[in-house]
Amino acid sequence: MSSVINVLFVVLVFVPSIYSAPPPNLTKDYYQKTCPDFNKIVRETVTPKQGQQPTTAAGTLRLFFHDCFMEGCDASVLIATNSFNKAERDDDLNESLPGDAFDIVTRIKTALELSCPGVVSCADILAQATRDLVTMVGGPFYEVKLGRKDGFESKAHKVKGNLPLANQSVPDMLSIFKKNGFTLKELVALSGGHTIGFSHCKEFSNRIFPKVDPELNAKFAGVLKDLCKNFETNKTMAAFLDPVTPGKFDNMYFKNLKRGLGLLASDHILFKDPSTRPFVELYANNQTAFFEDFARAMEKLGRVGVKGEKDGEVRRRCDHFNKLNV
């Protein structure tokens, strides 16, 4: 196992709004007439990208979560900072969002603009790409309804308090999830997305330096200490969130929590806290139950704060508003 944990990633990796019901035009076949090749183009773009960069799936899942929890699934996290506005993606909590996730959205948008210009929103691209990538690495299939519009605002100063942190308690995390309409069980199910991906050393350094958290598996802690010994000077150093099957979407994340192999304090607390432990036990013992609950939670996540025609647009470029906003 230690050989798996020792793999390093030099990279860039789990955001907020009030939950609202989907607008009437959010449908599975939204682009059937206006962009009939939408599904095909997304699928044919994500497949080679995931093959070339195996961390793309985890990064895109994280990017989607950060987008939806930050005032809805409206692609606001994709906006680039300019001289007038510091955008969400440049807030400290988003600084480690991986470049490969932004890149796959850009690639898909470019391909779609050639096939059906001005039709498909960046928000829908991110939602569809996330689902396709999750299933590519073994995760459950879930329905993605389409018709989201891209938002008009992206403010870095609004991010704080809307994203769960690496060292938060269950009550603190739950307060964030509840703002978006999610239950305690759904919090645990969505946390299972940590079965793929990684986290930078600074996010869990307090568990290994200066003293090791006694609830952390001793051998695992030793590997992490060696891995992260220079993390203050080399900020790219990272470890897998699931050190056993890091590239496979399965229920190993929950099994790991029972063995002291939860990387983040906010991972470990799910097993330690009596309110969430039964769900960890359920998912560790029953992958089917985890997949079913994760799929339902992802469908629900995709409906958070959706923008319609009146409060959104279809961006020409995913990192810029069509008109300058300040």
Swiss-Prot record:
E.C. no: 1.11.1.7
Highest taxon above the source species: Eukaryota
Chain residues that bind substrate: 164
Reaction equations catalysed: 2 a phenolic donor + H2O2 = 2 a phenolic radical donor + 2 H2O
GO cellular component terms attached to this protein's record: extracellular region
InterPro entries membership: Haem_peroxidase (IPR002016), Haem_peroxidase_sf (IPR010255), Peroxidase_pln (IPR000823), Peroxidases_AS (IPR019794), Peroxidases_heam-ligand_BS (IPR019793), Secretory_peroxidase (IPR033905)
GO molecular function per UniProt: heme binding; lactoperoxidase activity; metal ion binding
Any single Pfam family the record assigns to this protein: peroxidase
BP-aspect Gene Ontology terms: hydrogen peroxide catabolic process; response to oxidative stress
Catalytic EC class: oxidoreductase
Cofactor: heme b; Ca(2+)
Record-stated family: Belongs to the peroxidase family. Classical plant (class III) peroxidase subfamily.
Biological role: Removal of H(2)O(2), oxidation of toxic reductants, biosynthesis and degradation of lignin, suberization, auxin catabolism, response to environmental stresses such as wounding, pathogen attack and oxidative stress. These functions might be dependent on each isozyme/isoform in each plant tissue.
Protein name as it appears in the record: Peroxidase 41
